[in-house]
Amino acid sequence: MAKGGREKIKLQSTAGTGHFYTTDKNKKTTPEKMLIMKFDPKARKHVEYKEIKLK
């Protein structure tokens, strides 16, 4: 069987609301940490989300 190339990650809001998304990414093609703009429903606006490890 092939080794899984995708890693589960957590995207944490930088607005300080505690909101997060979970997703997965291909660790071979994108080894750097993700920084993406997404909607934070607690802040009610688009903010940056940083990748952190999923525990």
From Swiss-Prot:
Q: Which domain of life is it from?
A: Bacteria
**GO terms, biological process:** translation
Looking up SUPFAM superfamilies in the UniProt record yields: Zn-binding ribosomal proteins
Spell out the molecular function terms from Gene Ontology.
structural constituent of ribosome
- Keyword Ribonucleoprotein included in the entry's annotation: yes
Regions of compositional bias (Basic and acidic residues) in chain numbering = 1-10
Q: What Pfam families does the record point to? A: Ribosomal_L33
Q: Which residues form the signal peptide?
A: none
The region called Disordered is annotated at: 1-27
The alphabetized UniProt keywords are:
Ribonucleoprotein, Ribosomal protein
Q: Name one GO cellular component term.
A: cytosolic large ribosomal subunit
| InterPro entries assigned to the protein according to its UniProt record, in alphabetical order | Ribosomal_bL33, Ribosomal_bL33_sf, Ribosomal_zn-bd
Instruction: Point out the coiled-coil segments of this chain.
Output: none
List the NCBIfam families hit by this protein, alphabetically. PRK00595.1, rpmG_bact
Return the PANTHER family for the record.
54S RIBOSOMAL PROTEIN L39, MITOCHONDRIAL (PTHR15238), LARGE RIBOSOMAL SUBUNIT PROTEIN BL33M (PTHR15238:SF1)
| Protein family | Belongs to the bacterial ribosomal protein bL33 family.
Entry protein name = Large ribosomal subunit protein bL33
Q: Which organism is it from?
A: Polaromonas naphthalenivorans (strain CJ2)
Q: Gene name? A: rpmG
